[in-house]
Amino acid sequence: MSDMDHTCFDTAKIDKLQELRERGVTVYPYTFDRRDTVEEIKERFSAIEHDKSEEEVSTAGRVYVVRQHGKTIFADIGDSEGRIQLYLRKNDLGEEQFDLFKQYVDAGDIVGVVGHVFRTKMGEITVWVDRFELLTKSVCPLPEKFHGLKNVETRYRQRYLDLIMNEESRETFRARSRIISLLRQFLFERDYLEFETPTLQPIYGGANARPFTTHHNALDQKLYLRIAPELYLKRLVVGGFDKVFEIAKNFRNEDIDTNHNPEFTMVEVYEAYRDYNDMMNLTEEILSHLAEKVLGTTVCSFAGHDLDFSRPWRRLTMEEAVREYAGIDFPAMSLEELHAFGLEHCVEGCESAATRGEYLVLFFEHFGEKHLIQPTFIYDFPIENSPLAKKHRSKEGLTERFELFIAGMEMANGFSELNDPLDQKARLEQQDAKRRKGDLEAQMIDYDFINALGYGMPPTGGVGIGIDRLVMLLTGKDSIKEVLLFPQMKTAVPGQNGDKAEEGDGEE
């Protein structure tokens, strides 16, 4: 291999592949009549004794272990549902077939087998193989069988290998798939309609975040990957769809850590004639329902905590949370006192804070978030950082906005949605002014969205829930990379990012 060959190909395996082809063996056949999965075999023959079954089975899977004992071979194969043992005898297969398996089938190969089922003296349900077919010859070696794949970096970069070797990883992503399916079912049963809104957008909005930018050559136009589907879903409410949702891929050009990935999945839900109290209730109902369905209980273990999803959940205003965790009477303090308090406690961002609302958010983030382990709603946010939320009906300077925190992480964000077009125009103009002054996370002004509101949006409640973090909680994983099949990683190998390898792009 050349120095620029970054494949995992093993010379000995390549040699076996070539020898098989020289013998006329079809190494990569097109199909195999698999009639039984591993789990189906184990369930159907759970009561079998030592005699072979009369019924023939046909199954297939990846070879994990091969144990040779003279004229007999034991092997373990696995499919997406589990593993099962194979028993091969030279007297049954014939010398040619037996030697083919013995000499050329390795761990990592995929085989199809036909045979009968029996239980070994050790009590293991086993397929007594009458005939087999090599379906795929692997040319890359699997990790050592007793230790599996433990290197975290490799597990994330080569998820396919992680899934081959680690049942725990497969179970995590089965759970993720089930969580999303159950979420859809929950919303469908309550008459919400699912829609798809643009991922490429001429104007980004719906959240305060730095976007990814791209260029459409044919239109000669700058476009953005969406940071949220919010403004498009609200357009649908204006258009007459009263209950809508989208399970969306969002993209934010931000740091990567245990809770953040630049590409992530959220569900956003909007319902006409509802407010933020209704959306808090809906969020409780969704998450407690998912916990019960996935775990069989409303209690789950995460990061050393037993999290209780049973309803009702605790609710605190942001001012109440600051009073409890910062130990101050926020409403009674002057701006000067708030500034001095922030400097004294090294609160990040207080040097540039200019309003009471800015201090309130900074103090909550600094003192409060980390203590919110059990599901807790924080509500009544300052208007300064809530440009899409409706003004509070009775509290000056605040909005009807909430966030849900679990295990110190923000899990959901919802509002009584702002539907006053004049107010929305003024607030987005303020955001756009901040953006033009260098605030990279401030929102652009979207006049088409404002015009949509101008035609009339009914009172509406909305909420966005982070799917990735929810999966973390329900599977007990403390890193978002554990619940993303292909998390964003810095390019490690030249050519891995789509550039030509010889140019050296992506080298660390």
Curated annotation (Swiss-Prot):
The keyword Aminoacyl-tRNA synthetase applies. Its cofactor is Mg(2+). Its main location: cytoplasm. The lineage of its organism: Archaea, Methanobacteriati, Methanobacteriota, Stenosarchaea group, Methanomicrobia. Binds 3 Mg(2+) ions per subunit. GO terms for molecular function: ATP binding; lysine-tRNA ligase activity; magnesium ion binding; tRNA binding. Mg(2+) 2 binds at E410. This is Lysine--tRNA ligase. Belongs to the class-II aminoacyl-tRNA synthetase family. GO terms for cellular component: cytosol. It is found in: Cytoplasm. It comes from Methanoculleus marisnigri (strain ATCC 35101 / DSM 1498 / JR1). Homodimer. Its EC number is 6.1.1.6. InterPro entries: Aa-tRNA-synt_II, aa-tRNA-synth_II, aa-tRNA-synth_II/BPL/LPL, Lys-tRNA-ligase_II, Lys-tRNA-ligase_II_N, Lys-tRNA-synth_II_C, NA-bd_OB-fold, NA-bd_OB_tRNA. Keywords: Aminoacyl-tRNA synthetase, ATP-binding, Cytoplasm, Ligase, Magnesium, Metal-binding, Nucleotide-binding, Protein biosynthesis. The keyword Manganese does not apply. Pfam families: tRNA-synt_2, tRNA_anti-codon. One of its GO terms (biological process) is lysyl-tRNA aminoacylation. It catalyses: tRNA(Lys) + L-lysine + ATP = L-lysyl-tRNA(Lys) + AMP + diphosphate. Mg(2+) 1 binds at E403, E410.
